[in-house]
Amino acid sequence: MTPRALDLLDLPIIYHYRDEAVSLDSTRLLTRGNPLGAAGFMSYFNPARHLYTAVNQENGITLLGGVIQTNGDSFAKLVYIAPSTQLTHPGLPALIEHLSAEAGKWGAFHVLAEVDETSEAFPALRMAGFSVYAWQRIWDVSHITPSNATSGWTQTQSVNLPAVQSLYHQIVPPLLQPVEPTPKRAIGLVCAEGSKCYVNVTYGMRGIVLTPLIHPEATEVATRLIGLLNHLPERRNRPVYLCVRSYQAWLEPALEDLGGKASPRQAVMVKHLARMVKEEQAVRATQPAGVSIQPSRVSHIKVNKHE
């Protein structure tokens, strides 16, 4: 059966699958909780938001999945697929393709997904056109022992934005920059001294996720991290997690020494909905074997939306 949008008659299915969702967006899971929990699923019926869920019913099994795009982003994210007992179902790749096509209608150039490297969902994502562009590990740093370390961090101001963008270009590999765009807003925290440390902070009722950009030449990194955790604004006893991408893997020994707890390694995957070409047009992406990312510089982009 062809995948379709969720409707009100599907509410019993959502309730049945409420504990069987497989998250594909770690930050959203850790800050907001279960994507099919009572607090969040009604938002999928709001047509004003770029938040969409779909159903695929095949061979007596119903599959669910969700995708979201934050206002202003050039990419979308898969939120979840369900149920966890049907990750090898032959209809799952078609559902993922359908969700990606919806993101294309919003103007997204890419769709991202985060999945444990041993997950049974990995093959379905590959069949739906996703490829690995980075790896990451989520570290639980909630119980790192406090110390007398001073904060050393301040709220990012507009005057700090050029330094943050420069740090981004120094750390994020050029081939990944089309997928992970340059920070455009003065949010997060920066080191009070120098311009070698920045962290984006995502708050939610369930927890806080830190995404760092720390230059390898930064000094006293462990002390700076402890100071950050000791003085994190509006923490309110919520658990705190730190997301380490593969290009920042040198941070992991320091986190381990501090007492952080690592999650299983995750593949960060991307599906290209459009690629940029010199004719200043965006066309449907073709992905040659062995090539994950094809960045180009253009001054204007026109998007061919999915049919």
Where are these regions (language model features)?
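Conserved GNAT acetyl-CoA-binding A-motif
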Residues: 103-116, 235-246
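Amide-forming acyltransferase catalytic core, primarily the GNAT-like/NAT-type
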Residues: 1-62, 126-208
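Active-site/acyl-donor-binding loops of N-acyltransferases
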Residues: 116-118, 128-148, 241-307
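A structural feature that tracks compact, well-ordered secondary-structure segments
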Residues: 79-81, 98, 114-116, 124, ...
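Conserved acetyl-CoA binding element of GNAT-fold acetyltransferases
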Residues: 73-87, 204-219, 223-225
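Structural motif
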Residues: 6, 56-57, 65-68, 114-117, ...
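Conserved acetyl-CoA-binding loop-helix of GNAT-fold acetyltransferases
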Residues: 87-103, 127, 218-232
